[in-house]
């Protein structure tokens, strides 16, 4: 054999994609020492996505301190490609459910503010292309916190700011002010790994389907769904965009909807996004074996 491409996903909970690929490569080289072996660590947009993209682009980890779902400071990292143009962000690294103790899980009170802080940091470092994985969140704030970190301001009917973006404040939002939004956002491209098709609200929406997994009881679910309906109407009135029933708008507690409405994001299945980012179709050309 002259060329082998290794593209192995992680073995959940026991072996990362990178290590699995290295092991396979060592075995092949021990039998075919002259063979060209290309390792493409891979992920489906969930666990391991960030590290795979950093490695595939010869990028670097960027350490950052940001706010977790309960607005506590936490150290984490994201990635930037070697050319400095693309940022790789895993929402779960700062807004994820495992960061909230089981007894404090309440999507009425959690926020995506930290995810917005990471996006803002990457903007200030010059990134204009973003690849974001939004699985595993602890939130149902429809990305309100994220948007606040990027400069959006939300107020109620009396013109008073609603406070930190949490699920409980969605019902209060009546006005959106974008005058202080980070100026670089208009020139950015956002691609989001999203493997669900749920609408923004309703029986199949963010609150009813996902909020119970994040600690919500029946009363909370109903309140969150009402908040999402209100926010969707304010978005429609302000931007002219109706995200109510857009497939994927309900992902990550409504985060998908805000990414669509405010950042003009493109939602893609995680594996499709990863294969495109890795230039997979070109890498496997002329391969004798693909693992």
What are these regions (language model features)?
Residues 196, 201-241:
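Acidic, glycine-rich loop-and-beta core segments that form the ion-binding/anion-interacting portion
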Residues 24-99, 190-200, 206:
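Glycine-rich nucleotide/cofactor/substrate-binding loop typically near the N-terminus or early
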Residues 109-113, 117-120, 124-131, 138-189:
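Glycine/threonine-rich beta-strand-loop-alpha-helix active-site module
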Residues 74-139:
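Anion-binding (especially nucleotide phosphate/pyrophosphate-binding) glycine-rich loop
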Residues 23-27, 56-57, 107, 143-156, ...:
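A glycine- and small-aliphatic-rich helix-loop capping segment at beta-alpha/alpha-beta transitions
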Residues 11-17, 127-147, 246-254:
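Glycine/serine-rich anion-binding loops at beta->alpha junctions
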Residues 1-5:
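Extreme N-terminal starter segment of soluble prokaryotic enzymes
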Residues 223-287:
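Oxyanion-binding "anion nests"
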């Amino acid at each position: 054999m002259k060329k082998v491409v290794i593209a192995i996903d992680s073995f959940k909970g026991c072996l990362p994609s990178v290590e699995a690929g290295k092991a396979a490569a060592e075995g092949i080289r021990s039998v075919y020492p002259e063979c060209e072996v290309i390792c493409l660590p891979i992920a489906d947009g969930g666990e391991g996505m960030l590290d795979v993209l950093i490695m595939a682009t010869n990028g670097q980890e960027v350490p950052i301190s940001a706010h977790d779902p309960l607005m506590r400071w936490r150290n984490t990292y994201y990635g930037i490609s070697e050319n400095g143009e693309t940022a790789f962000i895993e929402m779960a690294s700062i807004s994820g459910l495992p960061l909230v103790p089981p007894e404090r899980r309440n999507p009425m009170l959690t926020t995506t503010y930290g995810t917005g802080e990471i996006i803002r940091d990457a903007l200030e470092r010059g990134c204009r292309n973003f690849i974001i994985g939004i699985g595993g969140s602890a939130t149902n704030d429809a990305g309100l916190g994220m948007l606040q970190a990027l400069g959006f301001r939300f107020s109620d009917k009396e013109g008073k700011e609603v406070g930190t973006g949490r699920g409980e404040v969605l019902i209060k939002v009546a006005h959106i002010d974008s005058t202080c939004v980070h100026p670089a956002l208009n020139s950015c491209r956002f691609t989001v790994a999203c493997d669900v098709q749920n609408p923004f609200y309703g029986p199949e929406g963010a609150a009813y389907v996902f909020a119970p997994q994040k600690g919500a009881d029946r009363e909370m679910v109903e309140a969150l769904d009402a908040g999402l309906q209100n926010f969707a109407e304010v978005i429609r009135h302000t931007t002219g965009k109706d995200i109510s029933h857009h497939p994927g708008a309900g992902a990550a507690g409504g985060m998908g909807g805000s990414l669509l409405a405010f950042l003009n994001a493109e939602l893609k299945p995680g594996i499709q996004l990863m294969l495109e980012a890795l230039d997979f179709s070109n890498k496997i050309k002329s391969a004798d074996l693909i693992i």
